[in-house]
Amino acid sequence: MAKGKFERTKPHVNIGTIGHVDHGKTSLTAAITKYFGEYKRYDQIDAAPEEKARGITISTAHVEYETANRHYAHVDCPGHADYVKNMITGAAQMDGAILVVSAADGPMPQTREHILLARQVGVPSIVVFLNKVDQVDDAELLELVELEVRELLSKNEFPGDDIPIVKGSALAALEDSNKTIGEDAIRELMAQVDAYIPTPVRPLDKPFLMPIEDVFSISGRGTVVTGRVERGVVKVGEELEIIGIRPTTKTTCTGVEMFRKLLDQGQAGDNIGALLRGVDREGVERGQVLAKPGTVKPHKKFVAEAYILTKDEGGRHTPFFTNYRPQFYFRTTDVTGIVSLPAGTEMVMPGDNITVDVELIVPIAMEEKLRFAIREGGRTVGAGIVVTIKE
């Protein structure tokens, strides 16, 4: 099946497969590429290259494909630990996920953990593929598994009753052995993904935010802060807030430059220098953010989901306990914080993923779903994401 070049005119959505080991995530990924992309064999996807995100090595396979309506980038991870790390670090951002559940086994421990993680890290929506239906002869049993999956999703605050569940066999699709549960099911799955997973809001359409990386003073012109615009647009003449570390202050952007050229605006993805009115060199520092007034607030206390590196990954060799005080690296700077473990958890071992309470010593511009690294003296020992802000 010859395919032309991907047209970038369609809306772009990032998705991934999640679910228990051996339930068929990689086979399903291969089957989708067979009908909607450049066909990748199972073993081509399974031999996933390693990449680094926030100082953590993760194996992820990336494939792309398109339906009539959208272009998709799809991530599949070979090992369970890779999923945990990927979801917490956001190495491959997911706008939605396809949960793969074997009809023969029903939901298993990693099914539960991936759904919980998806909730914690804010994967907005899930579509279910009930795989290996050819291994179940009893229609009632199939119905039971479907009910169990819906209950599990509802328990984790996903709309379990409304989520599309497509039944099929990834293997049948790959082997062309049964069109109904093979090709037809894969096409039905992608139709549901198209319809049910919303197109994400582009960074450009969100309110302006830029983490400050550096501060310069230019004689006769004032103070310039540099950084990469994370989202939104800033126009010359707009009022902005400087947030984090110190009390929030207001300023006006009197100039934007990029590659030494003056522009009338800077937008998401641009590396810019912003000239600020009425701010002296000492009034602003790396680690603060520049943002549209009233859109983001500084916070110190939050609940986080975190993954702690193993010794082999370059992490700690020993467990830690309540009152552990590492640095939390948010956007461009380290801030010391105190960790409190949940009741009943005595210690955290390298390789664990956990939910913890954190209190920073100074406030940082923070929103739910903001990601961070956990460091000790500049060495990454973990990664996390803000789940809930407390104050």
Curated annotation (Swiss-Prot):
GO terms for cellular component: cytosol. Its main location: cytoplasm. The keyword Cytoplasm applies. It is found in: Cytoplasm. Residues 55-59 are annotated as: G2. Residues 10-201 form the tr-type G domain. GTP hydrolase that promotes the GTP-dependent binding of aminoacyl-tRNA to the A-site of ribosomes during protein biosynthesis. Its EC number is 3.6.5.3. GO terms for molecular function: GTP binding; GTPase activity; guanosine tetraphosphate binding; translation elongation factor activity. Residues 19-26 are annotated as: G1. Residues 131-134 are annotated as: G4. Keywords: Cytoplasm, Elongation factor, GTP-binding, Hydrolase, Magnesium, Metal-binding, Nucleotide-binding, Protein biosynthesis. Belongs to the TRAFAC class translation factor GTPase superfamily. Classic translation factor GTPase family. EF-Tu/EF-1A subfamily. Residues 76-79 are annotated as: G3. The gene is tufA. Mg(2+) binds at T26. It comes from the Bacteria. This is Elongation factor Tu. Disulfide bonds: none annotated. It catalyses: GTP + H2O = GDP + phosphate + H(+). The keyword Hydrolase applies. Monomer. PROSITE patterns: G_TR_1, G_TR_2. It comes from Mesorhizobium japonicum (strain LMG 29417 / CECT 9101 / MAFF 303099). GTP binds at residues 19-26, 76-80, 131-134. Residues 169-171 are annotated as: G5.
